[in-house]
């Protein structure tokens, strides 16, 4: 019952997507019986199309999202179906997002999108100048402390 999902980058996207789907009234083939109490998202993709366009413009040689799109689908179809931002609902678990402002693979605005939509169900931990998982030891310690405090106050005592 005390399940927390956590993921980094693509894993963050999957943790958000799975947690949002499993906590809502969605029917899908691999729905779990247990609803997670929280999701810890490290710089995960929130909007697939937005990330695709960001990479297309800024790092086209690293646009890994291209391989996610089957020939018979569009980026819009895939994004609408698999972007966590598209399936936010009132019963989503509490979410912690850790994101660096200088991330060049998943733009920081994805963290801001979640923060704007989830409001009091979300803790945004911003790493000023942080890249995609390029944080110092001191930043890691500060992140861990904030996550621990959030989990104790908002998740484990409820």
Spans of features found by a protein language model:
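Primarily recognizes the serine-hydrolase "nucleophile elbow" in alpha/beta-hydrolase
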Residues: 1-54
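Mobile cap/lid helix-loop segments that gate and shape the active-site cleft of serine hydrolases
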Residues: 50-86
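Conserved serine/cysteine hydrolase catalytic core
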Residues: 83-92, 109
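Acidic catalytic loop of the alpha/beta-hydrolase fold
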Residues: 47-48, 102-106, 133-134
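C-terminal catalytic histidine-bearing segment of alpha/beta-hydrolase fold enzymes
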Residues: 108-158
């Amino acid at each position: 019952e005390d399940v927390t999902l956590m993921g980094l980058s693509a894993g963050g996207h999957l943790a958000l997507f799975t947690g949002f789907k499993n906590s809502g009234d969605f029917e899908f083939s691999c729905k779990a019986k247990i609803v997670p109490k929280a999701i810890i998202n490290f710089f995960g993709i929130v909007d697939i199309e937005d990330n695709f366009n960001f990479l297309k413009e800024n790092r086209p040689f690293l646009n890994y999202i291209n391989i996610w799109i089957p020939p018979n689908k569009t980026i819009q179809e895939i994004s609408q179906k698999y972007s966590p931002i598209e399936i936010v609902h009132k019963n989503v678990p509490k979410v912690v997002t850790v994101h660096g402002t200088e991330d060049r693979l998943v733009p920081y605005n994805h963290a801001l999108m979640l923060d704007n939509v989830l409001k009091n169900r979300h803790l945004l931990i911003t790493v000023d100048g942080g890249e995609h998982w390029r944080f110092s030891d001191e930043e890691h310690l500060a992140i861990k402390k904030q996550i621990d405090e959030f989990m104790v106050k908002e998740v484990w005592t409820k």
